[in-house]
């Protein structure tokens, strides 16, 4: 397989990184509730059990605790005061197998909980609990067990152990083991439509002005204000889920999100909160009502109603304010969300969805990334290509013409190359401004970009130290200058091929690749044509007598050759600009 194919497979593999819960077991955020944010109700009847080696203990005792049952992926074990199961963890644990279990600090108490280290399947976990000096009279062990993402049990009650002579106690049921009944959801009988967009409801559509009733490829999100609540309708093609988020800025993080996840023959609808670039933290559905969904021909549709203002929790934003709005889709399996494989659709500014109804579009590429791509295309498709051809083939065309004290071909070449350096430097900085760091998910593209940047800066530095034409070092400079420039151009083209299909600037496939191949072939063809033309002129000159060579400089053949070069150059520039405008127009449409 060719390197480009391998790279695309690598990108696809990276794109399928799951945004799951905590496969590494670092679940300190769930210490008190012991509940994973998986967006599914826990199972009611536990199939796992907790056993202890003795039921009477004294402070300082070391008691063996065993969690066992059918195979499971993750777990969280704590000991709590049996008379206050909603309180803090009590005591500390030690491990018997650090390969599958790890100690956590909960409620500021070191080693007071134990969790898994990976998603490796387990049948049994053995631990030792150490009773503290100020231990309560009765201790009960609790365990949360995750069999797979949407199948888990919360606070499975274990045996109660007591200190000597402590009065008997009746077992209590932990609150999280009480089954949570989600609000009922209805099945939508017909598709959403765009009627009322911009007049009675706020709409976001991509492609612009598409109608989800007739176009299955339409990504559609609408908000209809109804008193103190808002009715939300969301539709789009999706293999696993579609979602939208309200954000204070144009970057992922600290966002109020809503997920519609395909599960078997239905759709699970949940609010969520996104902290930084981590996976969504699924929240309770209590804030949503009138939940409904529809699945048909690969299109996911869901609707729900929520109040404009929800004081608690704070993760639910006030819909009376303005936000950037994101609309994303991606894969999901067994309720497990995977990272979206393309850039989310995003509004170009903040909107208040409960203010005046509007009908807007969006972009899947941030403006700053569009500028990056546009500048790189201009620099490495047009300015550098024309500049190189001028330097290689047009020195004899204007042998005596000068501009500001330098030969005209050199001034044109220098102007185009300075423009290339300027555009490259500015474009190089833009992704770092947007990301804030060196992207690890962009494959080889950023590495090639850094290489191009180094070579681009090196070229004018070399030019400053260019030796005079008559010195022997001029030949070394010429070869070094040519090799550095050629390497930069080849690597830049490779970087453009890879960059066109990255998430942040995903140009339409497969025409983007074919168009870039067309540009490369066009440039190579013109380059070879001018090279062949020059070779023919040189061969013709060598066949002439020695006394005729001096006449060649002013012969009709030479003038005809110059005219041919000018015609070819004019046609080349027109073709080059056609390719460039095609790419710039595609970027503008993102």
Swiss-Prot record:
What CDD domains is this protein classified in?
Cyt_b561_FRRS1_like, DOMON_SDR_2_like, Reeler
Which residues are heme b 1-binding? 372, 445
Q: Which residues bind heme b 2?
A: 413, 481
Q: Where is the DOMON domain?
A: 217-330
Q: How does it sit in the membrane?
A: Multi-pass membrane protein
Q: What is its EC number?
A: 1.-.-.-
Q: Which residues form the Reelin domain?
A: 12-179
What's this protein's function? Putative ferric-chelate reductases reduce Fe(3+) to Fe(2+) before its transport from the endosome to the cytoplasm.
Q: Please report the name of this protein according to its UniProt entry.
A: Putative ferric-chelate reductase 1
UniProt organism field: Xenopus laevis
């Amino acid at each position: 397989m060719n390197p480009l194919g391998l790279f695309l497979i690598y990108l696809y593999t990276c794109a399928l990184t799951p945004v799951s819960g905590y496969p590494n077991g670092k679940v300190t955020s769930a210490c008190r509730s012991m509940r994973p944010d998986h967006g599914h109700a826990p199972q009611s009847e536990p199939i796992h059990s907790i056993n202890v080696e003795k039921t009477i203990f004294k402070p300082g005792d070391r008691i063996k605790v065993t969690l066992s049952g059918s195979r499971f992926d993750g777990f969280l074990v704590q000991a709590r005061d049996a008379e206050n199961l909603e309180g803090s963890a009590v005591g500390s644990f030690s491990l018997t197998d650090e390969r599958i279990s790890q100690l956590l600090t909960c409620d500021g108490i070191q080693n007071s909980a134990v969790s898994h280290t990976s998603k490796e399947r387990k049948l049994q976990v053995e631990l030792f609990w150490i009773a503290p000096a100020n231990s309560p009279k009765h201790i009960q062990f609790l365990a949360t067990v995750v069999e797979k993402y949407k199948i888990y049990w919360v606070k499975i009650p274990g045996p109660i152990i007591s200190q000597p002579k402590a009065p008997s106690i009746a077992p209590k049921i932990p609150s999280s083991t009480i089954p949570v009944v989600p609000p009922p959801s209805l099945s939508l009988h017909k598709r959403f439509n765009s009627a009322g967009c911009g007049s009675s409801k706020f709409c976001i559509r991509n492609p612009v002005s598409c109608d989800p009733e007739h176009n299955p490829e339409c990504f559609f999100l609408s908000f209809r204000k109804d008193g103190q609540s808002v009715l939300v309708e969301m539709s789009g093609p999706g293999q696993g889920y579609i979602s939208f988020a309200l954000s204070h800025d144009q970057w992922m993080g600290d966002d109020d999100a809503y997920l519609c996840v395909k599960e078997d023959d239905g759709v699970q609808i949940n609010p969520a909160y996104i902290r930084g670039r981590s996976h969504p933290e699924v929240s309770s559905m209590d804030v949503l009502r009138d939940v409904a969904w529809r699945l048909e021909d690969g299109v996911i549709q869901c609707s729900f109603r929520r109040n404009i203002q929800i004081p608690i929790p704070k993760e639910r934003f006030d819909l009376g304010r303005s936000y950037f709005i994101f609309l994303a889709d991606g894969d999901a399996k067994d309720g497990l969300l995977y990272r979206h494989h393309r850039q989310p659709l995003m509004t170009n500014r903040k909107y208040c969805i409960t203010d005046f109804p509007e009908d807007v579009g969006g972009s899947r590429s941030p403006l700053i990334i569009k500028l990056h791509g546009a500048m790189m295309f201009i620099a490495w498709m047009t300015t550098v290509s024309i500049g190189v051809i001028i330097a290689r083939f047009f020195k004899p065309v204007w042998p005596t013409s000068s501009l500001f004290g330098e030969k005209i071909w050199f001034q044109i070449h220098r102007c185009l190359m300075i423009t290339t350096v300027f555009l490259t430097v500015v474009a190089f900085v833009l992704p770092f401004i947007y990301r804030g760091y060196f992207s690890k998910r962009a494959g080889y593209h950023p590495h090639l970009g850094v290489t191009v940047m180094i070579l681009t800066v090196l070229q004018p530095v070399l030019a400053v130290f260019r030796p005079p034409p008559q010195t022997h070092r001029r030949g070394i400079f010429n070869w070094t200058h040519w090799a550095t420039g050629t390497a930069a151009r080849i690597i830049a083209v490779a970087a453009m091929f890879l960059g066109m299909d990255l998430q942040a600037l995903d140009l339409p496939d497969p025409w983007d690749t074919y168009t870039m191949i067309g540009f490369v072939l066009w440039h190579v063809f013109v380059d070879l044509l001018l090279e062949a033309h020059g070779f023919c002129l040189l061969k013709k000159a060598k066949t002439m007598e020695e006394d005729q060579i001096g006449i060649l400089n002013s012969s009709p053949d030479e003038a005809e050759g110059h005219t041919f070069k000018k015609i070819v150059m004019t046609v080349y520039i027109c073709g080059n600009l056609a390719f460039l405008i095609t790419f710039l127009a595609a970027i503008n449409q993102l």
